[in-house]
Every structure is written in C-alpha cells, then in structure tokens.
C-alpha cells in the first residue's frame, strides 16, 4: 500500500493500528511494517511535512546535518525523529542515504552526508544509533524498544558513482563507474559506520542496494549485473562485511 499523505498524526496512528489488526487476524505472526522516506526537511511539502498535519519537527537535510560536523547532534536528531515516526505508526526509515557525494552533478548529492568518507562514516553511525536505540524504560531488549525505528541504509555499494553524475532511477543512469577506482572508500560509511554502531542494536537493520550495475567491480566472478543480483557484491562483500 502506498500512502503519501494523511490528515493528521492521529489519523496516521489509527490507520496503522487498523492495518496491524488486519494482519494479526491472518494468524502468521508477521506485523505490518510501515516505512517512510525522510520526513524532517526544513522545507514543508504536502507529502512528508504537511501530510502529517504539519506537526513534525523540521531539520536541515542530510548535507546540512553533516555540515554541522557534529555526530552527537545527528544522533539527537535521530532520537527525536524516531519518536515522531513511531507516533505516526512508521517502523522503518528508508534512510539514511550514506552514499559518498562523488559527483556534484548527481541529483541526489544533497541527500548524502558529503564527500568526506570519515565524516560520512561518523554521521552515518550516529544517525542509525539515534533511530534504532531505545533506552531506559523504553527499551525492551538489546537496545530495541518502543522508540526504535529500523534504519535502512542506502545505497549499497555506493550510489554516488554514476557515470557523469547520472541517476540510476532512470535508464540513462544504469552504470556505476566508480571514478578513481574507489570501491573500498565508497563502502566505508557502511562497513565502518552503519555496521559498527556504538549502541546496543549493533548495526543497521536493513540495506538497500542501488539500482546501478557496478561496472567492472566484481573481482571474483567478473559479472556486470545489477547490484541486487551480483553474488560478489551482495553475498561476499555485503554479508561478509
């Protein structure tokens, strides 16, 4: 179900509760999992900000958060945002976007934590910790609890590597070419950041591969196929990280 706006946080919570009741009746014990792209940008828009009744807090976008050079501030943002997500019935954040901003021509440049791999790694870790960790009375087990939201880091193995800055949502952006032959650098925000948290949840709970074909990056099988179908990139490199 794609739901892109609601009347108010109350309506969103009621909608979520009704969806949960529906799946509980199926008897398989699998809950509904409502997810959302980032909702806290400073600019108000109908879908993400006004679409939640206008009550959600507003923050700088990802590139702005990174420009603070303050991972602790980003962690605090994650804590606040996760509480608001849960109030709306959202259990999974389709964020953070932790691609390195390799090419300024890329249309999703502003959704990254910038070009510096060390800064992007630290901010990615803080963001995921903030979203996923519940503490004190809100914790149920191992850092997870009533204020936890699954963080889906994206885009493995680096979405800022498109040929000439073209975006892979479109056919003309099919190839990730990794200027500078820097695959290892591109995955640092994943391997050293989102997968090595300071909090008890330990690592990001979900990963979204990018839609590119990471050209000539498969050093084992030599396959040039979409990232999600590349055994080396997914089974060997991602799951082995």
Residues covered by each model-derived region:
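Glycoside hydrolase catalytic-domain context in secreted enzymes
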Residues: 1-241
């Amino acid at each position: 179900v794609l739901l892109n706006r609601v009347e108010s946080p109350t309506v969103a919570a009621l909608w979520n509760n009704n969806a949960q009741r529906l799946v509980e009746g199926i008897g398989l014990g699998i809950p509904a999992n409502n997810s959302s792209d980032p909702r806290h940008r400073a600019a108000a828009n109908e879908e993400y900000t006004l679409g939640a009744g206008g009550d959600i807090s507003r923050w700088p976008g990802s590139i702005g958060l990174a420009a603070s050079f303050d991972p602790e501030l980003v962690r605090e943002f994650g804590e606040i945002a996760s509480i608001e997500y849960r109030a709306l019935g959202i259990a999974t954040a389709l964020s953070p976007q932790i691609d390195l901003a390799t090419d300024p021509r890329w249309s999703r440049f502003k959704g990254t934590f910038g070009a510096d791999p060390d800064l992007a790694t630290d901010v990615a870790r803080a963001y995921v910790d903030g979203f996923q960790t519940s503490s004190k009375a809100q914790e149920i087990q191992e850092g997870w609890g009533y204020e936890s939201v699954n963080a889906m880091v994206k885009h493995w193995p680096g979405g800022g590597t498109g040929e000439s800055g073209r975006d892979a949502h479109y056919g003309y952006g099919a190839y990730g070419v990794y200027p500078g032959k820097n695959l290892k650098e591109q995955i640092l925000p994943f391997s050293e950041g989102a997968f090595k948290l300071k909090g008890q949840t330990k690592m990001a709970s979900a990963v979204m591969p990018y839609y590119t074909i990471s050209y000539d990056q498969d050093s084992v099988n030599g396959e040039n196929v979409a990232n999600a179908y590349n055994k080396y990139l997914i089974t060997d490199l991602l799951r082995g990280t």
